[in-house]
């Protein structure tokens, strides 16, 4: 039995999220079915971050145990073949120690949020960005974002159905920068609450529009109440970009 570390890229649009659910196709289901077609083994694949419906991944890390003997190149080629036509690609396959676990061994995770900030709609990037027509002040957003960096009670930025035992998280980085017509937000932490990144982005958008100040963000954080913060940004602009071990 060999444990494998898989690095995946996927378009989240056709999926109900990473995790298997009864209401539609999931990334986990697509991957486990591809593995079955390759090995005839029924397995459970674990991932570093269980993304929601419509959320994408540039480098999601997963782990799985396979009894079939094969090289890393063979596993990668077979899974990419059997994953068709799903928009999922296996970028890398590596053999790892039996105690490696994509979720529980993970020391940190990073997300990217993309806002297309222009008047014209998104023709090529529809479903992959949040289209915001009105001008956004990325520098003001970045300044306000620093109020959220560090260890805090993020109750104001967690989903109502969040199952985390504690709302306290340590945000190691939250940066905002304009790149051409895009405003890009990068968030890094050991772990995140459900919807935390999207709720922070929705709040920072209010700052970018000039409707909120950095002090308003601090007050929202201190309130420890979801209704005190901004709206939840759409799933379309969110990407899981990195997991480190």
From Swiss-Prot:
Glycoprotein listed as a keyword: no
Entry coiled-coil feature ranges: none
Binding of substrate, residues: 111
Enzyme class: isomerase
EC number(s) stated in the UniProt entry for this protein: 5.4.99.12
Pfam family, one: PseudoU_synth_1
InterPro entries linked: PsdUridine_synth_cat_dom_sf (IPR020103), PsdUridine_synth_TruA (IPR001406), PsdUridine_synth_TruA_a/b_dom (IPR020097), PsdUridine_synth_TruA_C (IPR020095), TruA/RsuA/RluB/E/F_N (IPR020094)
Active site: 52
Catalytic activity: uridine(38/39/40) in tRNA = pseudouridine(38/39/40) in tRNA
Molecular function, one GO term: tRNA pseudouridine(38-40) synthase activity
The keyword Kinase belongs to this UniProt entry's keyword annotation: no
UniProt-listed GO biological process terms: tRNA pseudouridine synthesis
Keywords associated with the record: Isomerase, tRNA processing
HAMAP family: TruA
Family of this protein: Belongs to the tRNA pseudouridine synthase TruA family.
Xref: NCBIfam families: hisT_truA (TIGR00071)
Subunit structure: Homodimer.
PANTHER family in the record: PSEUDOURIDYLATE SYNTHASE, TRNA PSEUDOURIDINE SYNTHASE-LIKE 1
Role of this protein: Formation of pseudouridine at positions 38, 39 and 40 in the anticodon stem and loop of transfer RNAs.
Protein name, as recorded: tRNA pseudouridine synthase A
Species this protein is from: Rhodospirillum centenum (strain ATCC 51521 / SW)
Gene encoding the protein: truA
């Amino acid at each position: 039995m060999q444990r494998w570390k898989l690095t995946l890229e996927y378009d989240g649009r056709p999926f109900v999220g990473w995790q298997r659910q009864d209401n539609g196709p999931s990334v986990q289901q697509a991957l486990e079915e591809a593995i079955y077609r390759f090995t005839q083994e029924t397995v459970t694949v674990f991932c570093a971050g269980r993304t929601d419906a419509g959320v994408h991944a540039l480098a999601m890390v997963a782990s799985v145990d396979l009894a079939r003997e094969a090289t890393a190149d063979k596993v990668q080629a077979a899974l990419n073949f059997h994953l068709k036509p799903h928009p999922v690609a296996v970028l890398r396959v590596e053999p790892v120690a039996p105690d490696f676990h994509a979720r529980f061994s993970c020391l940190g995770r990073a997300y990217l949020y993309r806002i297309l900030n222009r008047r014209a709609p998104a023709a090529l990037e529809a479903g992959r960005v949040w289209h915001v027509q009105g001008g956004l002040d990325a520098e003001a957003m970045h300044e306000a974002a620093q109020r959220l960096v560090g260890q805090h009670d993020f109750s104001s930025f967690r989903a109502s159905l969040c199952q985390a035992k504690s709302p306290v998280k340590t945000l190691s980085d939250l940066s905002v920068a304009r790149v051409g017509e895009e405003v890009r937000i990068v968030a890094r932490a050991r772990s995140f609450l459900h919807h935390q990144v999207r709720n922070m982005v929705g709040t920072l958008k209010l700052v970018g529009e000039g409707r909120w100040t950095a002090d308003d963000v601090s007050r929202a954080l201190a309130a420890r109440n979801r209704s005190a913060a901004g709206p939840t940004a759409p799933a379309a602009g969110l990407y899981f970009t990195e997991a480190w071990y």
